[in-house]
C-alpha cells in the first residue's frame, strides 16, 4: 500500500490524527515527572550495626564475622566488604547483575533475626543503594545557639512537617543533642549500700512498666486489666526506692544524681560559622523531585511565618538545578528546530517547504512525550538530552522526502504525482536508514551495569524520535506538500535558478565531479587516502585520557577532614572551621559553606561557589587551589575535590586492594606500595586504610578470682561497660516524647588507668571489690579500623590523578605491582573507580560491536544483499576515527558519553551512504554503466545529503558548545564527537563511498569470473 497516497486521499483522517497526537503531547508533557537523573538502582546494599563501647577487634569478632557468614549464605551475593571500627560495623554487599535487592534485603533480615549478637548490640540496619535517591532533594539548616532547643524544634516541628509532604521519603537530622535523664551514681555511697549500676538498671526497668494483666467481668461487660506503673517525671525517677541486699531500701536520689540534661554530643553542624542542625530531605522513589523540593521550600516558609523562633537557611535545593537543566534542554530543542528550518530555507528558498519542516518537527517531539508518559519515563538530564541530540536527526527523513518531492515538481510533474512518487522513491532508503539508526540503540539500552541504566531513557527517547520522524516523513510531509506545493511555480523557479545561479554553483559542482571522476578511475589512491586519514586521526587520539563521566561543574567543593584516633567531635568541628576560614581567605568565589562532624574521626565540609558565569575558575581548579592552601595544616588529613556525579557512580580514582590474613604483613605491604604510588607524578590524595596501631585498654577477667566473689566474666564486663559508657535502663515519656534514662558511673574511673583498676565492682553478697583484684587491666596495641573482603582481611590504597588522567596513573600502578614480590597467600589488584570505568567501557565496546552487526543485518535485509551493506559500512572506521580526533582537538576526555556517541554514529553516518548507494543502484538498474551511474547520481544527491548533515550538525552545536546551561556539560562530549564524525563522514561519503562501491563491485565481478572459468573448465573436461 502506498502510504503517501492513502494520507493524501484521506486528508481529514490524517490531520485529525496529527492534531490528536499534538494535543495529547501537550497534556502529557505537563504530567511527566521531573528528576535530575534516571532511576539508577545499583545492585548493592549497606549493612550498619552499632555496638557502643566495643573496639575494632571486638566488633570484628562479635559482630562483623557473624553478619558476614549470614550475608554470604544469601543467594545473589557477589562480594562482601566490611569495616570494623570503634562501636560500628559497616558492611557493603555487592549483588550479581539483575538481583532483586528488595527480595535480597528480606532474606538478609531473616538471616539476621536468627543470629545471636551480644547484649547491647543494636539491630543490623539494611540500606539498599539507589543513586538517584542518594542525592537529597533539599538540605535545610536550622540555625541557633541552643542546640537542645533546635533538636526539639527539628524533631517535633520541622521534620514531621516535611515528612508529611507528598513525595518525601525521609528526613534525617544531624548536628543536634538529645535530652536524657542521667542517673550518675556516687561510687562511694553506692558501694556502701552494695549497689551496682547493673542492679539499679534492673530496678528501674522493673519500676517503669505498662503491663497487660488480663480481663475481668463487670456484670456482663468484659473489661481489660492493665498495670500502669510508668514513670513520667525526673522526680519520680529520683524517688524510686532501691531494695538493699541487707534489707530495707534507699531512695535513688540519695545514692545518685538524677538530672534532666543533654547527652554528650556525637555530631556537630554549622552553616557559615553559625551553629545549627542540618536536615537532609530525601524524596520517595518515583516522586516528582522538582515538586518535592519546591514543596520543602514552601513548607519552611510557612513554618517560619507561623513560628518566629524558626531561623533557617536552605543551601541546596534540587529543583533549582533540575529547572536549569530542563530549561536548557528545551532551549536546545527550540534552537534546533529553528536552525533546521533555516537550513531548509537556505537550500530550497520556499516558504511552504520551511513551513512543512517547522510543523512536522514539533509534532514528532510531542508524539515522543506521549510515548514517554506511556512508558513511565521521567523528564531528566538523559531523556531530555536524548531529545536535544535527536532534534537534528528527526528532520533528516522529512528533508529527504521534501527535497525529493520538490525535485519531482521542478522536473515538471504535477502536484499529486510529485508528492506520491517523490515519497515512494525514497521510502526504501528511508526505512533502511531509520532502522539502522534505531538498531544501534537496542544493545545500548540492554547494556548491563550503570551504563545501561543511565542511557536507557536516552536510548528510548531517541528511538521514539527517529521512528516518529519516519512516520511523519511518509505521512504528514507529503500531505503538507500537497497543500502547500505550487508545482508550476517550483518548476519555473528551478529553470530560473538554473539560468541565474548556474555559474555560481557550477564551479563547485565541476570541482566535485572532477575529484569524483579521478578517484573512481584511480581506486587504489582513493583507498590509500582514506586509510591514511584513519591512521592520522587515531594517532592523534593515543594520549586522550579516559574518565567515567565528563566533569560537571555543579558549583560545589567537598572537603573531608580525617582526624587521629581518639579525637573528640569538638576537635573535628574545630578543624572543619579552620579549613573553612582558609577557604574564606583564599577563595573569592565562595558563596557559603556548611559542615557536619559526625564523629571525632572525621568532618565533611561543603563549599558552595558562585554561579559558573560569575567566576573564572572551575570547581576542580578551586579544589586544587584549596588542597595546596591546606597542605601545611597539621593534625589531620584533608582531601579536596569538586562535587562530582561520577564519584557517586563508582568514583574517579584508582584503588589497590591487598588481601591476606596477617594484619602486620598487610600493613607492611600497604606501606611499601603507598610510598611508591604517592611518588607517581601527578598522584594526589594517596592514602591507605591501614590503621595505625593505637593504644587500647584491655580488661581480662581472672575467672578464679571472680568466682571467689561470686562474679562471672560477663558480670564484670557489664559493670565496667556501665561504669564507663553508661547503660540505657528504660525510657520515660515527657511532653509526648520518649526520653532515655541512662545509668552511669560518676566518671572517676575514666580519669586514669589506676582509677579504672580501683573501680568498685559490686558483688552478689552486697559488698564490692576493686576491678584490679579480679582482672588484669593493661594497655595493648590494636588497629584503628579492620577491613575485610569476602571474609578475609583487606587493606585498600586509594588515590587520584591531579589532571584526572586515571588511565595513565593505573598504567604506572600496574608497573609497580608487576615489580613487587608479594608473600605467599597475599594478593594485590587494581580496583576502585578506574576498574568500574573500564567495566562500563567494556560493556559499551561490546554494545558498539553488536550495533555494527545489527546495522549490517538491517541493511542486508533491506537490500537482500551480502555485499551492499559492506559498501555502505566502509564509512564507519573513518567516521569513528574522525569523531575521536575531535576530543584532543577540543581538550575533552574519552568518557562513556563519547563512546555512546560512537554507537550513535554507527547508525547515523551510514544514512548518507544508503541514500547515495541506493540511488546509484537505481540508475544502474535503468541501464547506465557503473561510472555513469556514479557521476550522475552523486551530484543529484549532494543537496539532500548536505541538508540532512547540516541540520543535524547545527542542532548539535548548542549542545557541543554548552550554550544552553549546565546540562550540556555532560552532553557536550557527545555533541562534539557527533559533529566531528558527521563532518568527516559526509566528506568521505561524497568522495570515497563511490570508490568503495567500485572496489567491492570489482572484487565481486572478479570472483564471479573465477567461478565462471572454473565452471567452464569443469564442463570442458571429458
State where each predicted segment sits.
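Signature of alpha-helical transmembrane segments and their immediate interfacial
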Residues: 1-34, 424-426, 497-550, 607, ...
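C-terminal transmembrane helical bundles of large multi-pass transporters
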Residues: 318, 384, 632-1004, 1022
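Helix-loop junctions and hydrophobic alpha-helical segments within the transmembrane domains
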Residues: 322, 326, 402, 407-435, ...
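Transmembrane alpha-helices and their membrane-interface boundaries in multi-pass membrane transporters
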Residues: 391-405, 426-446, 453-498, 605, ...
